[in-house]
Amino acid sequence: MPPRPQRLAPVADLPPVFAGIDEAGRGCLAGPVVAAAVILPQEYALPGLTDSKKLTAARRESLAEGIRSCAVTWGIGVVWPRDIDRINILQATFRAMARAVRVLRQPPPAILIDGDKTLPPHVLTSLSCDGHLPTQRAIIGGDGCIPAISAASILAKTFRDRLMDTLDRRYHGYGFAKHKGYGTAEHLAAIAAHGPCAQHRLTFRGVRPNPAAEEQLTLW
């Protein structure tokens, strides 16, 4: 059985070296789901490091620069809408997390994931290094209490926001730069007026309502 998620992980209980993992964009109607993995050094100076959702955009960008500078290693994983529709958002999120871990300069002996789910066996196996798999733990609220997970949440969010700004310049009329792909009233009105574009998740309710869309909403 997978390890039970924890609500808090006291510092004494943390492995000595681990990668914190978090995602951004899971609930959006458009754009990719992005995950980040971060290994922080034993000592670092990143005052105000916390869950990215509690920070202003300017503060996130400032912290992201500091994280990239001081991290032992960090990585980003991206899965685009076509694959999200094909394998579902839960599996796409797992895939993005695995991709983020695989691009780290050193394989982590352990990974701590924000939320209540760990990587399934078929995804975890892809992270094997010299026959060894990282241990893993899911920590509910980890982005607010584990600095490496907080750092991952910030890198994932800032990276994805910049991607959505770029997509806004390519796909006019949807307001991606403003709402970042979330299902705001403005975004839903744009979909109704123009129809979905190549960056929309066609299996999500609000983009193209159908039975599969309802299924997507129950997978996390």
Curated annotation (Swiss-Prot):
<keyword id="KW-0464">Manganese</keyword>
<feature type="binding site">
    <location>
        <position position="22"/>
    </location>
    <ligand>
        <name>a divalent metal cation</name>
    </ligand>
</feature>
<protein>
    <recommendedName>
        <fullName>Ribonuclease HII</fullName>
        <ecNumber>3.1.26.4</ecNumber>
    </recommendedName>
</protein>
<comment type="function">
    <text>Endonuclease that specifically degrades the RNA of RNA-DNA hybrids.</text>
</comment>
<keyword id="KW-0479">Metal-binding</keyword>
<dbReference type="GO" id="GO:0006298">
    <property type="term" value="P:mismatch repair"/>
</dbReference>
<dbReference type="InterPro" id="IPR022898">
    <property type="entry name" value="RNase_HII"/>
</dbReference>
<keyword id="KW-0255">Endonuclease</keyword>
<keyword id="KW-0963">Cytoplasm</keyword>
<dbReference type="GO" id="GO:0004523">
    <property type="term" value="F:RNA-DNA hybrid ribonuclease activity"/>
</dbReference>
<keyword id="KW-0378">Hydrolase</keyword>
<comment type="similarity">
    <text>Belongs to the RNase HII family.</text>
</comment>
<dbReference type="GO" id="GO:0032299">
    <property type="term" value="C:ribonuclease H2 complex"/>
</dbReference>
<dbReference type="Pfam" id="PF01351">
    <property type="entry name" value="RNase_HII"/>
</dbReference>
<dbReference type="GO" id="GO:0043137">
    <property type="term" value="P:DNA replication, removal of RNA primer"/>
</dbReference>
<dbReference type="InterPro" id="IPR012337">
    <property type="entry name" value="RNaseH-like_sf"/>
</dbReference>
<feature type="binding site">
    <location>
        <position position="114"/>
    </location>
    <ligand>
        <name>a divalent metal cation</name>
    </ligand>
</feature>
<dbReference type="GO" id="GO:0005737">
    <property type="term" value="C:cytoplasm"/>
</dbReference>
<dbReference type="GO" id="GO:0030145">
    <property type="term" value="F:manganese ion binding"/>
</dbReference>
<feature type="binding site">
    <location>
        <position position="23"/>
    </location>
    <ligand>
        <name>a divalent metal cation</name>
    </ligand>
</feature>
<keyword id="KW-0540">Nuclease</keyword>
<feature type="domain" description="RNase H type-2">
    <location>
        <begin position="16"/>
        <end position="216"/>
    </location>
</feature>
<dbReference type="GO" id="GO:0003723">
    <property type="term" value="F:RNA binding"/>
</dbReference>
<dbReference type="InterPro" id="IPR001352">
    <property type="entry name" value="RNase_HII/HIII"/>
</dbReference>
<dbReference type="InterPro" id="IPR024567">
    <property type="entry name" value="RNase_HII/HIII_dom"/>
</dbReference>
<dbReference type="InterPro" id="IPR036397">
    <property type="entry name" value="RNaseH_sf"/>
</dbReference>
